[in-house]
Amino acid sequence: MRKLAYLAIACTTVITACGAEAPQPSPQPTAEPPLAATAPPRPNLPNWKEEMPLPFPFPEGAFAPVDAFVQAQQLGRGVNFGNMLEAPKEGEWGLVVREEYFPLVRQAGFDTVRVPIRWSAHALRQPPYTIAPEFFQRIDWVIENALQNDLNVVINMHHYEELFKDLEGERERFLVLWDQIATRYRNLPPEVLFEPLNEPHGALDNESWEELFKQVLAVIRRTNPHRNVIFTGADMGTLNGLLQAKRPNDDPHLLATFHYYLPFAFTHQGAEWVEGSSAWLGTSWRGNGTQRANVDYDMDRAVRWGKQNNMPVWMGEFGAYSKADLDSRVAWTNYVARAAEARGLTWAYWEFGSGFGVYDPISLQWNEPILNVLIQKQEATGR
């Protein structure tokens, strides 16, 4: 399995560092040709100090790059570890990441975990904007557990609310945070993907977000020249936001993503954080002809955008809040997932164990009706 190969490489590195004799390294993978487009120059950023080594080191250049279209398919069926590390403080929203969650989601049949992270709450507010070592260690642990359980892992930056309100005041800090993240994880296997920002909005319109994405991509590429990075549109990362965007440059290691919560009055009925959503309570989704046609139309538009921009497209979030009736949630989830898959789109469900959850962390039981339309049992047991 992939995880065993990675652990073997990591163990070899540790043994060598301790002075023991290690096997001769395998031939290094052939480097890819230079990127088709010249990346913009890396901004002058405040110096920060990398204070601690990774607990699971990998040698530089140990892994061959993965084609973006290939990796988009490898993401398969994923789940978001939402309401955990993107809370102001882990546990504040009722959930923490637990070790048993990783084998649990893998054994259920998921291929990927997307990990929303509020990095901005765990770093200095002033230069050099250093990320707290103990928080980095927590993310190290998450990544290590994902890889050990043969899961792809998408690391993002979530709920950077200050950036959405004050782009110029937060631009430098945003770039320095990603400089630290990218540098720390530069030698990890390609199954670790970077998603620079979740749901750009507010001060980030299409034009300003495209400019900022190019800047952060240049920062990442200094240490991760071939890691796949995930691009999204503005307008909260919606499909409409993606459709209004264009491929940022000719970098071959880019995937595109969008989030799908339509019809919004159905998926967010009764959501406490959405003003007026209580008026939508009782909205159902039974999959009539018009409802199915709307989903098909949207998925066709996502695929068309990908072809026009020569980028693989990944649906990074979709789900319906638990205030909707279960039959409607099951019908909607099933149809959206199957419509995406029929067009070659992979996805990650929002989310694991909270208000949209496919798992109940209190009863320690899966929400079987939702799980069974996300991943059929015969597929899960055959893995």
Can you name each region flagged by the protein language model?
Residues I15-A17:
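C-terminal motif of bacterial Sec signal peptides marking the signal peptidase cleavage site
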Residues F81-V97, A121-I131, A265-N294:
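Acidic/histidine-rich helix-loop elements
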Residues P29, L35-R114, Y129-T130, W305, ...:
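N-terminal carbohydrate-binding accessory modules
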Residues F56, D325-R383:
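Aromatic-rich peripheral "rim/lid" segments of glycoside hydrolase catalytic domains that contact
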Residues L175-Q291, D296-A320, A342-R343:
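Active-site region of glycoside hydrolase catalytic domains
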Residues P59, L95, F102-D111, T130-H159, ...:
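An active-site-proximal structural segment forming one wall of the substrate-binding cleft
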Residues G19-E21:
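Bacterial signal peptide processing site
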